Amino acid sequence: HMRNHSGTKPFQCTQCSYSCVNKSMLNSHLKSHSNIYSTLCQDCSYATKY
């Protein structure tokens, strides 16, 4: 919690300049670099990575 107040962002993406305060946020961000879609609509072409 204190990282939010101190501005420390120790978790950094190896593919871009993104950094964040916790590993969970980094894991969510890493999905943006993949071509894997976790949600696909069966009725249209809508897809999301999250």
UniProtKB/Swiss-Prot annotation:
One of its GO terms (molecular function) is DNA binding. It comes from the Eukaryota. It is found in: Nucleus. Keywords: Developmental protein, DNA-binding, Gap protein, Metal-binding, Nucleus, Repeat, Zinc, Zinc-finger. GO terms for cellular component: nucleus. The keyword ATP-binding does not apply. A zinc finger (C2H2-type) spans 1-5, 11-33, 39-50. Transmembrane segments: none annotated. InterPro entries: Znf_C2H2_sf, Znf_C2H2_type. The keyword Nucleus applies. One of its GO terms (biological process) is segmentation. Belongs to the hunchback C2H2-type zinc-finger protein family. Gap class segmentation protein that controls development of head structures. This is Protein hunchback.
